Amino acid sequence: MLEEKLLKKIKTINENFINLGFDLEEDFIELVTQREDIRDRIENTKYKKMTFSKDEEANSYILNLEDCQISFDIIEGEDEEGPWFEVECNIIFF
């Protein structure tokens, strides 16, 4: 279970992604649950130092921290059941 303070920060971060066009809260929670190093970076990076962007061409939503970039790549399609999407997360450390 994630701490309330971290969940609040994730909700605030997700508001930026929603403003860019996509709700990534569940995917973000899954990421910080699976990757302790990313959770620590999120907890220890001040919100003001985070930047957010969208790569329209790649359909990616990007969070830049001080020493890494997290991109959520959205793959969309349609089948006999209707439209679907998948989210793939990529992390680049600098």
Residue ranges and their predicted role:
Residues 1-38:
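N-terminal trafficking/processing presequences and adjacent post-cleavage segments
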